[in-house]
Amino acid sequence: MKLHLLKSKIHNAIVTSGDLEYEGSITVDSELLKKADMIPNEKVLVVNNNNGERFETYIIKGDHGSRVIQLNGAAARCALPGDEIIIMTFCEIEAEEAPDFKPMVLIVDKNNNPKRRHRIGEEDEQLG
C-alpha cells in the first residue's frame, strides 16, 4: 500500500506580488526551492495563514536570491501581497517506509530569507 505524505514545505513565506494575467502557478525564488527540496513544475498545496484559503498550483522557478513568492493567474486571487502562506509538496511512499520518512521544513523570515531548516524529527540547521 502507498501513502501520500508531506514531502517538504516552506513555512511562513510572505507573498511578494501577484499577476492575474499569467496562466497560473506560484513563482518561488530558486534558492528557496533548493533549500526546501522542491523543483519547478512540482504540484503544491498553498495555505493562506491570513484567511484560511487553500489552493493547489505548480511551481515556477524564480530568480536566485530574489526572495520572490508571486502568485499567478487565478491563484493571485487567493492571497494578496503581504499575506503569510505555507507552500507544501507531497509524495507517495510505501507504507513500510513511512515510519522512517522525514519531510523537509524550510522556515523563512518576513523578507523570505531562509532562517533555518530541518527534517521533521531532527535538529534545525541555522541558515541566516
UniProtKB/Swiss-Prot annotation:
Keywords annotated in UniProt: Autocatalytic cleavage, Cytoplasm, Decarboxylase, Lyase, Pantothenate biosynthesis, Pyruvate, Schiff base, Zymogen
Gene Ontology terms, MF aspect: aspartate 1-decarboxylase activity
InterPro entries the UniProt entry points to: Asp_de-COase-like_dom_sf, Asp_decarbox
Biological processes annotated in GO: alanine biosynthetic process; pantothenate biosynthetic process
Modified residues (Pyruvic acid (Ser)): S25
Residues at the catalytic site: S25 (schiff-base intermediate with substrate), Y58 (proton donor)
Pathway this chain belongs to: Cofactor biosynthesis; (R)-pantothenate biosynthesis; beta-alanine from L-aspartate: step 1/1
GO CC terms: cytosol
Pfam families listed in its UniProt record: Asp_decarbox
Cofactor info, note text: Binds 1 pyruvoyl group covalently per subunit.
EC number: 4.1.1.11
Location (main, coarse): cytoplasm
Location(s) in or outside the cell: Cytoplasm
Superkingdom of origin organism: Bacteria
Residue numbers binding substrate: T57, G73, A74, A75
Family: Belongs to the PanD family.
Function according to Swiss-Prot or TrEMBL: Catalyzes the pyruvoyl-dependent decarboxylation of aspartate to produce beta-alanine.
Xref: PANTHER family: ASPARTATE 1-DECARBOXYLASE (PTHR21012:SF0)
NCBIfam families: panD
Protein name (database record): Aspartate 1-decarboxylase
